[in-house]
Amino acid sequence: MSYNTFGHIFRVTTWGESHGPALGATVDGCPPGVAIEAEAIQHWLDRRKPGQNRFTTQRQEPDAVRILSGTFEGRSTGTPIQLMIENTDQRSKDYGEIARSFRPGHADIAYHWKYGLRDYRGGGRSSARETAARVAAGGVARAALAALVPGLRIEGYMVQIGPHAIDRARFDADEIERNPFWCPDPDTAALWADYLDGLRKAHDSVGAIVEVRASGVPAGLGAPIYGKLDSDLAAAMMTINAVKGVEIGEGMAAACLTGSANADEIRMGPEGPEFLTNHAGGILGGISTGQDVVVRFAVKPTSSILTPRRSVTTDGREVEVVTKGRHDPCVGIRAVPVGEAMMACVLLDHLLLDRGQTGGLRGTIG
């Protein structure tokens, strides 16, 4: 199985399976001299780890990260950084009944068709457990961004679960860390809690939409045509488990706007040009404008549910499948820190690409 690596200069390779002894990431291309501590990476992993509330899987994993290489005296050396996270709470017996049947909505049947075999224990590489490695790599990227672009900030939050979207008029960034949904609207967070409780009792699950916003992004990241920043961001978010759609800025809603409404007008401010709106999501022509970079992605409902679903076995028999084990009623909740990590990795990668191509030179206006 190839294609376990992403990035151009800042390159991340993830490895390991959901029920294997460990998983992790090999990070190559981090500039030397960046302050990197396991405790700082652990902070980001703790936001993603399972079992923290009744709305996520009850699998109890500490997700304790170990840095095996690539640092010396707390700083990156420029060599590959190896990050490892041990699995400690696997229950492979929960998956014995699906060893020869395919779970509807899962990658099981696609993996079987392509490779002729699959790791049925939690889905192996297709499990969302793989995203812990991405969050660890994102911690390295955040550390490098903090050193290279002080003031750059990345924040993710939920904007919709099922049919229930936040009211943006009540958007309060301070609320994001105060509830289990990373929700900036406290009224909607309370509604989501009741809604998910009902779904759990009905042995069902639901999808969600996550928004990730990066502020303080310098203008000039990305390149025309095949090196677009938004192209790489969309690709990065689409690699996250269960993601089925990605939007940049206004996204699909831009199709409903007129040109006069969608085009972000510009005026001269005290420090140069200023945009009056941000329908473009901080990217024009594939290149960052200095505005907030805004990405949204849609996560499908968790496929592992206790409701019986029709399927087939490896020998062609029709069966009903009930997926036992511990699963998220809404996998979108824990996708928030993953989206943040992917944003960090892509922004750092493009920052390094830009420095290599232009040396940081910029055109001037005024």
From Swiss-Prot:
Q: Sorted alphabetically, which PANTHER family does this protein's record hold?
A: CHORISMATE SYNTHASE
Q: Does Ribosomal protein appear among the keywords? A: no
> Which HAMAP family has this protein been placed in?
Chorismate_synth
Metabolic or biological pathway: Metabolic intermediate biosynthesis; chorismate biosynthesis; chorismate from D-erythrose 4-phosphate and phosphoenolpyruvate: step 7/7
Pfam families found in the cross-reference section: Chorismate_synt (PF01264)
Q: Which organism is it from?
A: Cereibacter sphaeroides (strain ATCC 17023 / DSM 158 / JCM 6121 / CCUG 31486 / LMG 2827 / NBRC 12203 / NCIMB 8253 / ATH 2.4.1.)
Q: Which gene encodes it?
A: aroC
Q: Where does NADP(+) bind?
A: 48, 54
What EC identifiers does the entry list? 4.2.3.5
> How is this protein named in the record?
Chorismate synthase
Family membership, please give it.
Belongs to the chorismate synthase family.
Gene Ontology cellular-component terms listed: cytosol
Tell me which residues bind FMN.
Answer: 125-127, 241-242, 285, 300-304, 326
Q: Which stretch is the leader sequence?
A: none
Q: Which reaction does it catalyse?
A: 5-O-(1-carboxyvinyl)-3-phosphoshikimate = chorismate + phosphate
What's the stated role of this polypeptide? This reaction introduces a second double bond into the aromatic ring system.
Q: Alphabetically list the UniProt keywords.
A: Amino-acid biosynthesis, Aromatic amino acid biosynthesis, FAD, Flavoprotein, FMN, Lyase, NADP
